[in-house]
A protein has these predicted regions:
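Conserved class I S-adenosyl-L-methionine
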Residues: 1-38, 145
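Class I SAM-dependent methyltransferase SAM/SAH-binding core
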Residues: 46, 52-96
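A conserved beta-strand element that flanks and buttresses the S-adenosyl-L-methionine
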Residues: 108
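A short, conserved alpha-helix within the catalytic core of class I
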Residues: 116-126
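Conserved beta-strand signature within the Rossmann-like core of class I S-adenosyl-L-methionine
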Residues: 134-142
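Short, glycine-/aromatic-enriched active-site segment of Class I SAM-dependent methyltransferases
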Residues: 141-160
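Short alpha-helix
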Residues: 161-176
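Conserved S-adenosyl-L-methionine
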Residues: 178-189
Length: 203
């Protein structure tokens, strides 16, 4: 099997990242609106696994967002993000290796955490090293046990993925020490259970 970063590099070359943006946009907007509605002062933001940077570009249009950073481990994704947004901040790094120079108020991630062998390690790393006190982590995953239609994705895409249940994901957030944990299914339609969204705050 290929590494996830190699797969995503190939997808950029084939312009498949544009399709990812279109597919993920409804759930991402749901997550961002949930998060933004709970922010009442200026805030900073990281998109973990930013791809071609479309979420960072969107967040930079938000009046209260003072700093938006995109981090991704795929070279071609970061290169494309920088081409599309010469003023944006995009960093090439494995998420487990990255530590921002200053912690942020909101960390978002869509369809990323299950590419890690042990997602709990990444949740803990982000919680401990990326997020300010009272800040929020919010992630979305379509690859989870109850979503039967996704069970062949790892084989079809040719890269390892960590299959977890909805309860497993929620338990990871609880075990990390995050507080005010909520989860829901976003954008259910046509037999698709929906994107599993999990969020919690640092106290």
């Amino acid at each position: 099997m290929k590494s996830a970063t190699r797969v995503f590099n190939e997808w950029v070359i084939k312009n498949k990242d544009d399709g990812m943006q279109k597919t993920h946009s409804p759930a991402v907007m749901d997550m961002l609106q949930y998060s933004l509605s709970r922010l009442h002062t200026a805030f900073s933001f990281i998109d973990a696994g930013c791809g071609n940077g479309w979420v960072v570009r969107y967040m930079n249009t938000q009046p209260m967002c003072t700093n938006a950073i995109g981090v991704d481990g795929a070279t071609e994704m970061i290169n494309k993000a920088k081409r599309l947004d010469t003023k944006g901040r995009y960093i090439l790094s494995d998420l487990l290796d990255y530590q921002p120079s200053k912690k942020v108020d909101l960390v978002h991630s869509m369809e990323v955490f299950y590419y890690f062998i042990d997602p709990s390690i990444l949740v803990n790393h982000v919680k401990d090293n990326w997020i300010e006190t009272k800040g929020r982590l919010i992630i979305g995953v379509d690859y989870y046990k109850e979503n039967v239609g996704c069970h062949n994705w790892s084989e079809d895409v040719g890269t390892p993925m960590k299959m977890l249940s909805r309860k497993d994901w929620v338990d990871i957030f609880h075990s990390s020490g995050l507080s005010n944990i909520k989860h829901w299914l976003s954008c259910s339609n046509n037999g698709f259970l929906g994107t599993l969204v999990i969020t919690g705050t640092v106290t």
